[in-house]
């Protein structure tokens, strides 16, 4: 027991024995100084880094908070726009339904209007054809002119003829429809009215716009196009030319002489026949011819008229020969 206790005591003293290192005093002082400096500066450095990290953390937290707010705002905006989109889509669907309903109503209205227009055209064609037939009577013409709708009738006549010619769109074929019959009947009525002295006087004094329209339409129609209407309009002008005032008005219209020569190029013999008659009206009236003699002679399509004087169409041949004879007489008198 005694030996064991002594050994244990010896071991305890050995474990607690201090160890020493030999260091030069100078090194110890330098080490001591450095330790003091570290002890002095380390808290400052650590405190600065911690503070900086803390500030950065604050900034990050603020940014995160702002981002969260922005995200929340974006969510609210998204919900708002989604609601607006749904509203717009609903409005769009409603508008489409309304437009579809309106389109159906418009189509129905167009169909009704078309039916009414067809009915009016049929009625106009029938009524004007009947009036065309009876207007060959002087008494009927006087009755027409004596009414308070005569001016309106001839104004509408000119407008209707003009619209019809514009609608042809280059078609050179004769049209066989209620619309064309309506227009032909109107032109025929004008021709018959102009065939009566009081009718010519009325047209020259009160319906010059109609005469201007006829001259314009004769220039608008191409050679071979709608010859029946051309013939009726030329007959109207010829009848008006029987009236000296009417002949003066027509012949003084701008481009009248070139129009006559252009119309003579039409392939239809009936058109050329009535052009020659109108030319003859100008030639046989000295007061009128003297004003356009220079232009007349310088542009006269003599070869075309000579060819017509040898035509197989007896009426065209006779008219051309008479015009050539009248021209020779004029040259002889000059």
From Swiss-Prot:
Sumoylated by UBE2I in response to MEKK1-mediated stimuli. GO terms for cellular component: chromosome; cytosol; nucleoplasm. Residues 83-334 are annotated as: Interaction with BRCA2. It is found in: Cytoplasm; Chromosome. Changing residue 167 to L: In POF19; in mice this mutation leads to a decreased protein stability with reduced fertility due to a lower frequency of crossovers in meiocytes. GO terms for biological process: double-strand break repair involved in meiotic recombination; female meiosis I; male meiosis I; spermatogenesis; transcription by RNA polymerase II. Residues 14-51 are annotated as: Interaction with BRME1. Testis specific. Overexpressed in some tumors. InterPro entries: ARM-like, ARM-type_fold, HSF2BP. Keywords: Chromosome, Coiled coil, Cytoplasm, Disease variant, Premature ovarian failure, Ubl conjugation. Residues 49-122 form a coiled coil. Its main location: cytoplasm. It is linked to Premature ovarian failure 19: A form of premature ovarian failure, an ovarian disorder defined as the cessation of ovarian function under the age of 40 years. It is characterized by oligomenorrhea or amenorrhea, in the presence of elevated levels of serum gonadotropins and low estradiol. POF19 is an autosomal recessive form characterized by irregular menstrual cycles and cessation of menstruation in the third decade of life. Meiotic recombination factor component of recombination bridges involved in meiotic double-strand break repair. Modulates the localization of recombinases DMC1:RAD51 to meiotic double-strand break (DSB) sites through the interaction with BRCA2 and its recruitment during meiotic recombination. Indispensable for the DSB repair, homologous synapsis, and crossover formation that are needed for progression past metaphase I, is essential for spermatogenesis and male fertility. Required for proper recombinase recruitment in female meiosis. Associates with HSF2. The interaction seems to occur between the trimerization domain of HSF2 and the N-terminal hydrophilic region of HSF2BP. Interacts (via C-terminus) with BNC1. Interacts (via N-terminus) with BRCA2 and BRME1; the interactions are direct and allow the formation of a ternary complex. The complex BRME1:HSF2BP:BRCA2 interacts with SPATA22, MEIOB and RAD51. This is Heat shock factor 2-binding protein. It comes from Homo sapiens. The lineage of its organism: Eukaryota, Metazoa, Chordata, Craniata, Vertebrata. The gene is HSF2BP.
């Amino acid at each position: 027991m005694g030996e064991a206790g002594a050994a244990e005591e010896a071991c305890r003293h050995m474990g607690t024995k201090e160890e020493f290192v030999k260091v030069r005093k100078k090194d110890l002082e330098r080490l001591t100084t450095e330790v003091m400096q570290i002890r002095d500066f380390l808290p400052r450095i650590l405190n600065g880094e911690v503070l900086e990290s803390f500030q950065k953390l604050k900034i990050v937290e603020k940014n995160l908070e702002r981002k969260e707010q922005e995200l929340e705002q974006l969510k609210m905006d998204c919900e708002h726009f989604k609601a607006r989109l749904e509203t717009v889509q609903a409005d769009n669907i409603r508008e489409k339904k309304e437009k579809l309903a309106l389109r159906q109503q418009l189509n129905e209205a167009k169909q009704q209007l078309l039916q009414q227009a067809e009915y009016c055209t049929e009625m106009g064609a029938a009524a004007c054809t009947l009036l065309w037939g009876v207007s060959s009577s002087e008494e009927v013409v006087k009755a027409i002119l004596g009414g308070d709708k005569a001016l309106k009738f001839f104004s509408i006549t000119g407008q209707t003829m003009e619209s019809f010619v514009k609608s042809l769109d280059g078609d050179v074929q004769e049209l066989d429809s209620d619309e064309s019959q309506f227009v032909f009947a109107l032109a025929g009525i004008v021709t018959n009215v102009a065939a009566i002295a009081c009718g010519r006087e009325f047209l020259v004094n009160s319906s010059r716009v109609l005469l201007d329209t006829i001259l314009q339409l004769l220039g608008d129609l191409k050679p071979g196009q709608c010859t029946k209407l051309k013939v009726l309009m030329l007959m109207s002008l010829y009848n008006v030319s029987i009236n000296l005032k009417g002949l003066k008005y027509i012949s003084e219209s701008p481009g009248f002489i070139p129009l006559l020569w252009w119309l003579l190029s039409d392939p239809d013999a009936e058109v050329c026949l009535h052009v020659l008659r109108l030319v003859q009206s100008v030639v046989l009236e000295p007061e009128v011819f003297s004003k356009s003699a220079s232009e007349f002679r310088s542009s006269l399509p003599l070869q075309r008229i000579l060819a017509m004087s040898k035509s197989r169409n007896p009426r065209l041949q006779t008219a051309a020969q008479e015009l050539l004879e009248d021209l020779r007489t004029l040259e002889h008198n000059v």
